[in-house]
Amino acid sequence: MESCLSFSSPPPTKKNIQEPVRPNAKFHKSVWGNHFLKYASNPEQIDYDADEQHEQLKEELRKKLVVNVTNERVEEQLKLIDAIQRLGVAYHFQREIDAVLNNLLLFRSNKDSDDIYMVSLRFRLLRQQGHNVSCSVFEKFKNIDGRFKDSLRDDVRGLLSLYEATHMRVHKEDILEEALEFTIYELEQVVKLSSNDTLLASEVIHALNMPIRKGLTRIEARHFISVYQHDKSHDETLLKFSKIDFNMLQKLHQRELADLTIWWEKLNVAEKMPYARDRFVECYFWGLGVYFEPQYSRARKMFVKVINLTSLIDDTYDSYGTFDELDLFTDAVKRWNVNETDKLPEYMRPLFMELLNVYNAMEEELKEEGVSYRVEYAKQSMIQIVTAYNDEAIWYHNGYVPTFDEYLKVALISCGYMLLSTISFVGMGVTTVTKPAFDWVTNNPLILIASCTINRLADDKVGHELEQERGHVASGVECYMKHNNATKQEVVIEFNKRISNAWKDINQECLHPLPVPLHLVVRPLYLACFMNVFYKDEDWYTHSNTQMKECINSLLVESVPY
């Protein structure tokens, strides 16, 4: 589904522009430096014992998944699939999971008809897989007066399962809105009445803060391993497999980071661009949110290079460049020619040159596979975002506060997710993504608009005050307050409402029939999840020396103990 919005930039004018004093953003230095270089210093060592055990355990799990679904096995199968997905190893069993869930659509089980836990789990798993199952299955859990039954309060596991299911809701599903309100209240009561050190209370607290639908797979897998191993009913084969798999992937990610660190150090950002955020490892972490699987290694490396350069360009526009300098850089990117380099100020030249180099390298590599056309889509997306950055610079230098609608037309581009969604496709395998998929993602489908909306409004909510302190174009908060005569609290309420609706759009767009395969549709979803995690209460990317550092350490430094 295509958005009816037009994203052509408004025609700003340059009037009475005075040369500004360069702002001083005062971003903290890189947290990680060249920490990950050490993973390149040792030759790659294969743990043959772990590798062999990994394959044996995988085959055992596969056999458990392919058994015939019967009344007696439905609950067991659904719980196994849920655990496999939450432990981050579903990519090994996608065909088997698809087969089980497809069969489940045809299979009617009476066993779970009055079990809120199983009904909710079945609903969530099917919707996660793109099946448009009806939410009417929850009607049976209501009283005659239209309220959820009091008996549900005694089933904490059932409440938790229903709560997770509500996050798959789309527009006009009132029963799921009611269920969300009901479960949040009841689960908060559980927390109040329980000791926070109990496993169940901890699960509830975690779920209320980060529902499954909106979490990042690798972060949630790391968390769920510790939860699952204390579950008395856990599958020992699955637990062992997930730990080995987590550590094997971690080693791959460490080697990728080592290779990319060599590239990054050559840019010498700390000296050549000291005004910018040096967030190389954090950008890699962003890439892991989009895809962590080994088959996307090349795509991930390309993605990480582009997002790092985009972050530097963003800071050049927001935190350092003068109006005339930014105009020159914008023109250079639009012309996309190495001859433009000499027209740029000295400090901009390394950045512009590396942008061309990275894109040229991608094109050369993809040319061998006959898919170099992909880079042209990536190039146009980069030109689009740089143009949006410049439009915002013009607003700032003119002291212009756009209407909220004007702001969104530019800000949904400058947030970066249109570019990143396109880039996320570029390095994928030849058969994984085709030209029609690039036409789809670059034509502003609703799921992408929704992801951009979540990005922009979440960022504006947590970061606008700091941006205004250091000199920045008016954020969505200021634009909405000025032109709607609203208070900051009213803006937050409005933004939260829009973000909630955007999640419903995302859920709707992930249901069959799909315009492109689900493994492509979900990339904007995963980008939205990143914002939900790292911009929930503050800007973890800019202030990456606290919670972001802890997350990176748990996923990319510390292995899971066996």
UniProtKB/Swiss-Prot annotation:
Pfam families named in the record: Terpene_synth (PF01397), Terpene_synth_C (PF03936)
Binding site residues for Mg(2+) 2: 314, 318
Enzyme class: lyase
Tissue: Predominantly expressed in root.
Cofactor descriptive note: Binds 3 Mg(2+) ions per subunit.
Family of this protein: Belongs to the terpene synthase family.
Protein name: Valerena-4,7(11)-diene synthase
Species of origin: Valeriana officinalis
Source species taxonomy: Eukaryota, Viridiplantae, Streptophyta, Embryophyta, Tracheophyta
Gene field: TPS2
